[in-house]
Every structure is written in structure tokens, then in C-alpha cells.
């Protein structure tokens, strides 16, 4: 198992798919990393040399990923809540933030229905 950005990555996966296991790296960024490091997207992690793995690690560290990105997201949400702005209040009430309807739908965000007592 290779270790990139503090995440264990399975050896049997292709490089592009394996990089997507890191929080903050999606398909586009994964392909960009492969392009910058001149590593073929079809190679599996198992077949990479130590130098290629080190190149991947260095390239991934140029982006904000994993714990730092999670911290940024939570701090930006907390900032909105502290400002008492509309978006912050929607986050606090656990309702949709971007103007979606809530009379029906929004069950994922609101959670399961609460039973009413008779």
C-alpha cells in the first residue's frame, strides 16, 4: 500500500482512481497531477517506482487536501454562522442553504421526519 497525503492507497487501483481517494482530489485534478508528473493514467499503483511515488506525493502536497481542506470548509461555515447572515442561519438550522424548497423534499438535509404526538 502506498501512502499519499496521509491516506493509504490500494495497490490494485489505477493512478487516476487511486488519487481520488484523497479528500480534495477529484477526477480533473487527478488527471492534472498525472499530466504534470508524466505518469500514465493507466498504470497501477503497484507498478510505480519509488521515484514516481515521491513525484506524486510532492505534486499532491501543492494542493490543499485532507485535513487542511476539511478545516477550511468548517471554518468558513462557522464564519457564516458567526456573522448571523442568512446562509449562516440556514446552516445552523440544518436547512438547505442555496434557495431550495423545503415544504416538500429536503429530507436529506433535514433528516428523517419527526413523529407528532397525539
Curated annotation (Swiss-Prot):
It comes from the Bacteria. Keywords: Ribonucleoprotein, Ribosomal protein, RNA-binding, rRNA-binding, tRNA-binding. SUPFAM superfamilies: S13-like H2TH domain. The keyword tRNA-binding applies. The keyword rRNA-binding applies. Belongs to the universal ribosomal protein uS13 family. Located at the top of the head of the 30S subunit, it contacts several helices of the 16S rRNA. In the 70S ribosome it contacts the 23S rRNA (bridge B1a) and protein L5 of the 50S subunit (bridge B1b), connecting the 2 subunits; these bridges are implicated in subunit movement. Contacts the tRNAs in the A and P-sites. This is Small ribosomal subunit protein uS13.
Amino acid at each position: 500500500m502506498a501512502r499519499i497525503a496521509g491516506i493509504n492507497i490500494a495497490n490494485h487501483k489505477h493512478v487516476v482512481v487511486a488519487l481520488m481517494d484523497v479528500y480534495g482530489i477529484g477526477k480533473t485534478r487527478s488527471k492534472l497531477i498525472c499530466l504534470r508528473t508524466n505518469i500514465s493514467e493507466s498504470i497501477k499503483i503497484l507498478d510505480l517506482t519509488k521515484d514516481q511515488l515521491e513525484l506524486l506525493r510532492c505534486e499532491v502536497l501543492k494542493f490543499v487536501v485532507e485535513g487542511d481542506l476539511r478545516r477550511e470548509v468548517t471554518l468558513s461555515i462557522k464564519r457564516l454562522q458567526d456573522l448571523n447572515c442568512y446562509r449562516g442561519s440556514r446552516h445552523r438550522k440544518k436547512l438547505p442553504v442555496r434557495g431550495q424548497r423545503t415544504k416538500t423534499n429536503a429530507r436529506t438535509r433535514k433528516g428523517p421526519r419527526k413523529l407528532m404526538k397525539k
